[in-house]
Regions:
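N-terminal intrinsically disordered, acidic low-complexity segments at the extreme N-terminus
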Residues: 1-9
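Tandem repeat scaffolds
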Residues: 11-17, 21, 37-179
Length: 179
């Protein structure tokens, strides 16, 4: 009886072709998975906290509190979650830098170039941003409580959910001004 049921289900020869296709598919899937696992990832470079200030430097997660970086070119730098409290960045070039979630309380950024910089969630409490150029920057979720923004043009700058200079929270769709 079992043979009769087997022949009904798989035919006279037991349908070995279907079994072979299944095994081949499993082998191919295994090879593809192994190739994906062994392939290099597009991971960010390791932070170098001892690196000198330069364009593209990676100081993410480093402590640079109180650093004197007056007029330094830090364009395209990676400084995610970097401690820059009380740092002197007057006139520094931070164009295109990633300062997301950086701690910059009390820093001096007067006259700095922050065009296209990512300041998403950055702590900017008490920061001096006077005359800073911020076109194309993203300040959503940033904390600007007590910051000095004299002669700063925020036109087009996302400020959604940022904490404004006076402590109020900007509306999620705020751009250029805190609504």
């Amino acid at each position: 009886r079992m043979r009769a049921l087997h022949r009904q289900a798989f035919g006279e020869k037991g349908n070995r072709g279907v079994w072979r296709i299944g095994v081949a598919a499993a082998v191919v899937a295994g090879i593809i998975g192994l190739a994906w696992w062994a392939s290099p990832r597009d991971e960010p470079p390791t932070p170098d906290c001892a690196a000198a200030p330069a364009p593209g430097v990676n100081w993410s997660y480093c402590d640079r509190a109180g650093a004197e970086l007056i007029g330094k070119d830090l364009s395209g730098s990676r400084m995610r979650e970097t401690g820059l409290q009380r740092a002197d960045l007057r006139g520094a070039n931070l164009e295109g830098a990633d300062l997301s979630f950086a701690l910059m309380g009390g820093a001096d950024l007067a006259g700095a170039n922050l065009r296209g910089a990512r300041l998403f969630g950055t702590d900017l409490r008490g920061v001096r941003l006077n005359r800073a150029r911020v076109a194309g920057a993203n300040m959503a979720y940033a904390n600007l409580r007590g910051a000095s923004l004299e002669r700063v043009d925020l036109s087009g700058v996302p400020l959604g959910n940022a904490i404004w200079v006076d402590g109020r929270t900007c509306a999620p769709e705020s751009v250029g001004e805190c609504d």
